[in-house]
Swiss-Prot record:
Cofactor: Mg(2+)
EC class (word): transferase
Catalytic activity reported: adenosine(37) in tRNA + dimethylallyl diphosphate = N(6)-dimethylallyladenosine(37) in tRNA + diphosphate
GO terms of biological process kind: tRNA modification
Record protein name field: tRNA dimethylallyltransferase
EC number annotated for this UniProt entry: 2.5.1.75
Domain of life from the UniProt record: Bacteria
Similarity remark: Belongs to the IPP transferase family.
Keyword Transport part of the UniProt annotation: no
Record flagged with keyword Oxidoreductase: no
Residues where ATP binds: G19, P20, T21, A22, S23, G24, K25, S26
UniProt xrefs under Gene3D superfamilies: 1.10.20.140, P-loop containing nucleotide triphosphate hydrolases
Organism of provenance: Dinoroseobacter shibae (strain DSM 16493 / NCIMB 14021 / DFL 12)
Subunit structure: Monomer.
């Protein structure tokens, strides 16, 4: 398949590239940067973590030498990082050399191009209570939110535990409905109309063997060594521990499963993650330019 037509892009037009894991996003970003110039900026919540270069498929040192890269591997283990942190980090990069923003975290792109509500962070104590209530009595959480915040309840999928918990946490933390916070969303940093927007298509039958092949390559390139270095600090609930494949490799290092079983489980988890990404992109990026499989 051909590369997307670059002749329609001006050299200073921001570029956004989204797509599921293992679909070739980074390769496409690098080709555009080498042909037209620009700074490649990470928009993947997993690739910000310093602990995982191989396991999150961050660009290699060789690729980083071919074009400037920003916001990769800059977050230390245990350091909080959210979409709000990312927006603050990306802001100065929008006014310098043309940014080529690439990643698989749909929320980053939505916040960048549509704005982000300035909702205070949920305290750990509230999050713990919310987790316990959702897991122990989700019906009670639904009823409580419905009674105290009918405005938000009418707008969200009340059968979705994560959506309900988020709205409940915001109400508990701020005393204000999530719907009202969202209504006060500030203007976006980069309106969609200003950027060239590409989303990589990755049908599951095409992507599945790529995922399996890539995880095998990760093992060959040192993913197990990364997990071994992380083992003394392991906290399964920590954001940095959410790297796909990390829990499985840690389980192997602890003697709980074989390496073959870890590889199979990690590959399966990656396929499931890619499915969630495809669902997000189909729902929210219908006006983005599709890039056929293999174009990158």
């Amino acid at each position: 398949m051909p590369l997307p037509d670059l002749s329609t892009l001006s050299a200073d037009q921001p570029v956004l590239i989204a797509g599921p894991t293992a679909s070739g996003k980074s390769a496409l970003a690098l080709r555009i940067a080498e042909r037209q110039g620009g700074v490649i900026v990470n928009a993947d919540a997993l690739q910000v973590h310093h602990a995982w270069r191989v396991l999150t498929a961050r660009p290699s040192p060789q690729d980083e030498a071919r074009a400037p890269h920003r916001l990769y591997g800059h977050v230390a283990r245990g350091t909080p990082h959210s979409v709000g942190h990312w927006l603050r980090e990306v802001t100065p990069l929008l006014s310098g050399q043309r940014p080529i923003i690439v990643g698989g975290t749909g929320l980053f792109f939505t916040a960048l191009t549509q704005g982000l509500s300035e909702i205070p962070e949920v305290p750990a104590e509230v999050r713990a209570r919310a987790d316990a209530l959702r897991e122990g009595d989700f019906a009670r959480m639904q009823a409580d939110l419905g009674a105290r915040d009918p405005e938000t309840s009418a707008r969200i999928d009340m059968a979705n535990p994560m959506r309900v918990q988020r709205a409940w946490e915001v109400l508990e933390t701020t005393g204000r409905p999530l719907a009202r916070w969202q209504a006060d969303t500030p203007p976006p940093l980069l309106p969609r109309s200003r950027a060239a927007r590409f989303v990589l298509e990755a049908p599951k039958d095409w992507l599945a063997p790529r995922i399996a092949r890539r995880f095998r390559q990760m093992l060959d390139q040192g993913a197990l060594d990364e997990a071994r270095a992380a083992l003394p600090h392991w906290d399964a609930a920590a954001p940095w521990a959410r790297a796909i494949g990390a829990p499985e490799l840690i389980a192997h290092l602890r003697g709980e499963i074989t390496l073959d079983a870890a590889e199979e489980a990690a590959t399966r988890a990656t396929r499931q993650y890619a499915k969630r990404q495809r669902t997000w992109f189909r729902a929210r990026m219908r006006d983005w330019t599709p890039v056929p499989p293999g174009s990158a």
